[in-house]
């Protein structure tokens, strides 16, 4: 390749005026993320303006939960709320395996439509939540500051947590395959909360399940690139390639050159510009892009942020980011 491909996490979303306008018309997040036409329209908003190399499905990692018998909602200003947190063996036994065709047909339809829209000008990306992160939401009842409930389960009743993690593992492997069968050309796995675990606990409660997902997907879809993103993963970096994923997405708290060294040469990287950089001057943004690309080298790098675009980011700065990125030549 002559330059690194580029897309941005949360490239569709609240920093865009076109998205804000849509939110006024459709105030409920679940409606915006579960209606085919809206999902396609929102996913394409950044594509129409910036022409990124990757167009990621507009969705949420919790979208499969109702299909697993776990009701949830996303409440404005509060984030995700799981109404009946899973805290007992009996509650976990009620969790069903996820059948995407039955519960989220709009995801498959949206991916197919996105492929038709972007043709071969960009890759269509799908995504799923990782088992430990999904379990964290479901046990905590939503987002958490200290993760004491999931850790109580992990350390006092590990068998219950392993049962839940296994259900999410089987379900997410199926969900990735479903997305690939409907047009996703790469899938990113978000394990946002795995970095709350110590390395030894990551090796028990996250790593084996991620590896199982990757192994299962590679059996049926050997050529589907899988990306793993876990924010704050500096303490776990060397362990991430053991999952078998093709790409590790680094957050900005790890220096790109050091991250590459620590990951080894057999794995591609994605990232890792600090999203806050997009509040800087255009010169500053340019400098940071070049810095990141130089440190990543010319092999196996997807340019991205180290986390999602922040609300309030000036759209013109995002436009500048893409312009500079697409002008790079190795």
Curated annotation (Swiss-Prot):
**Marked site: Transition state stabilizer:** 60
| Superkingdom as given in the UniProt entry | Eukaryota
Q: What is its main location?
A: plastid
Q: Which UniProt keywords apply?
A: Chlorophyll biosynthesis, Chloroplast, Decarboxylase, Lyase, Plastid, Porphyrin biosynthesis
The cellular component terms of Gene Ontology attached to this UniProt record, alphabetical and capped at eight, are:
chloroplast
The record's subcellular locations are: Plastid, Chloroplast
> Oxidoreductase among the record's keywords?
no
Q: How does it assemble?
A: Homodimer.
Please explain the role this protein plays, according to its UniProt record: Catalyzes the decarboxylation of four acetate groups of uroporphyrinogen-III to yield coproporphyrinogen-III.
HAMAP family in the record: URO_D (MF_00218)
Q: Which PANTHER family match?
A: METHYLTETRAHYDROFOLATE:HOMOCYSTEINE METHYLTRANSFERASE RELATED, UROPORPHYRINOGEN DECARBOXYLASE
Q: Which NCBIfam families match?
A: hemE (TIGR01464)
Name of the protein in question: Uroporphyrinogen decarboxylase
* Gene encoding the protein: DCUP
